[in-house]
């Protein structure tokens, strides 16, 4: 059996690292922003266009695929890579976060989380064991331990109890994964390679609990570590402080994944702190609402002032949308509620995010000082 | 001033012709199926993909663009080619048909048609003169005379009165066009070329009126002729009979355009009768409803029987959808109400229509007998 997963740091610049992951479906250069393909599609974007944009890894959501078309269906079809015809890397979340945020009726016990489907109200249970079974059946390259995402705000005792539960679930996740990892649909055809299971650090907004969670998760031992429980409503200064404190507690030779982040200036900021992987629905969801990220700040394309604007969306962007269409046309498509608005807006926003990450990576490799990392203008934070 | 518009018949096979139109924005091989890009977008399909599909000419709807973003807006932006970033040929309808079918409150007088916008209820008047002004401002390569599309069913006296009105409007359309054709936005930059104004034959379901309309429209004189007033609810045998009777009355050296047609087997049938141009929302609209045209008949992709089907949509199709994705995946996208379903379904249906027309053209050029024109299987007519 050859190595299923590897990660190499190739250059550093302060805390920031440029690295390279190798998964059973190819290489991923880090730091990397991973587009979200909820139900095995990045909304509105064909797979060949994702390739053209340089996407090396994308997300699928276990909760959604579990409900539709179902894990056994995907397994029968050879796993999610074959199902969605995407031969590069894929990561799945554990389903835990989605259950917390989407299900009205959920109940957490030591065993796991019982919940009702947002589609038809049917009853289901996710546990560390079932989350592993689902993620193995779906067959992404990187899968996540089943955790409890602590709500915000939460008291310290509640947060600690939640963290302890996540640690017990991490052990159970690892045990279940080790027992069944050979059941991934592409095990034989990929030279008996298996998936990589990442652990998740919780601990809410308490630095000491974050520290304890990090140390004890590392003790269990995973090929990569995620920081979970952020983007739950806390102030972004809090996130930044906790991430900065936690990163040094994680092994240098393993990838670090900050879940559910963020705005363009945030993904740059966290890459500087030594985060290697990030994902967020923001570029794709914002695109659907006509909110576009550019080198000149963000803009809301439905604004009347773009109706006669013959210029490109972003004069400094070389994506196919900026090279071909005017703001006036994009504004017209959005105002007319045309599907092409979503397709083109999403194409640009993804291009902007991926390009931002590539420039960060390049700066790290060239050893440029941190000031020369891409500057993301403040309008991102204020203007709409 | 060089020639603005030309049409050459390059080969014939029975009544069918293979020809070539040259417009100020390039060549169009006929017979041709023209995708409908209502508000300057073929719903969900980026322009580079239309180019890849081999689209040489597409439609814009004057009514829709007149209301949003407005003719003066498009003129200011250089015309619809620049506006939508499409440098190949475009045809606009006159707005007449849309007014008849979309406006609740319309009133026809000798002057024109007054109507209320379906968007905001505002009052407007379309006349031959204003329809020419709108179409010149939008700046398609081929524009249409303003006509009255006679409703179905209609009595003979009513149909004759309507036909006479259309003939008077045809004269007025031509006069207005000749007086203002140099005002097209790209007049100077395209070497003082202007648009081509086509006449429209009406006459309802009465062969004698169709004949009279054809003869008197030809007498007025246009560089191309359309058959209007079909696809209004009449039986398709009736359409076929009237088209077959009318085509021989039109000049051999001018393109013939059958408006608003049709199913795959119909576009083949009408090309055989000597029709050179057709347009229809069917391939794009059907795609949005999951109805897909294939060499094996048509299929409704949401059907449960496709949930585990790993085969391509159409094993005989070489479009990028059929080459990459399985029916199971397309079914999943449709069942999940994903935008990518519309993008991929539309891509395939357009590819199927364009490919069908290319094969018809090839058969005419090779002088194959009519039996060897592409056979479109009967399931198109029955199964869903």
UniProtKB/Swiss-Prot annotation, chains A, B:
GO biological process, alphabetically ordered: queuosine biosynthetic process; tRNA wobble guanine modification; tRNA-guanine transglycosylation
Region of interest: RNA binding: 260-266, 284-288
Pathway: tRNA modification; tRNA-queuosine biosynthesis
Catalysed reactions listed for this entry: 7-aminomethyl-7-carbaguanine + guanosine(34) in tRNA = 7-aminomethyl-7-carbaguanosine(34) in tRNA + guanine
EC number: 2.4.2.29
Annotated binding of Zn(2+), by residue: 317, 319, 322, 348
Top EC class for this record: transferase
CC per GO annotation: cytosol
Residues annotated to bind substrate: 93-97, 147, 202, 229
Residues at the catalytic site: 93, 279
Subunit relationships: Homodimer. Within each dimer, one monomer is responsible for RNA recognition and catalysis, while the other monomer binds to the replacement base PreQ1.
Known function: Catalyzes the base-exchange of a guanine (G) residue with the queuine precursor 7-aminomethyl-7-deazaguanine (PreQ1) at position 34 (anticodon wobble position) in tRNAs with GU(N) anticodons (tRNA-Asp, -Asn, -His and -Tyr). Catalysis occurs through a double-displacement mechanism. The nucleophile active site attacks the C1' of nucleotide 34 to detach the guanine base from the RNA, forming a covalent enzyme-RNA intermediate. The proton acceptor active site deprotonates the incoming PreQ1, allowing a nucleophilic attack on the C1' of the ribose to form the product.
Name listed for the protein in its UniProt record: Queuine tRNA-ribosyltransferase
Biological source species: Koribacter versatilis (strain Ellin345)
Gene: tgt
